[in-house]
């Protein structure tokens, strides 16, 4: 069995952006790899009471805490 391999040069990443690779098998037997940029990672501190409230909302909404924060921040930025 012969495999055709193509090499591509990936762009250098100077930020803390993480990348995700998806593999898809084509009908002709080849495998297509797709490189996607994902979100940047940031960190910050929350008071315990605010974190507890965030956890309650995340459980109630069945979403991650990160997703709740992204939604709230997007709404805030739109209204500034």
Swiss-Prot record:
SUPFAM superfamilies: Ribbon-helix-helix. It comes from the Viruses. GO terms for biological process: regulation of DNA-templated transcription. This is Uncharacterized protein C-80. Essential for virus function. Pfam families: RHH_1. InterPro entries: Arc_rbn_hlx_hlx (IPR013321), CopG (IPR002145), Ribbon_hlx_hlx (IPR010985).
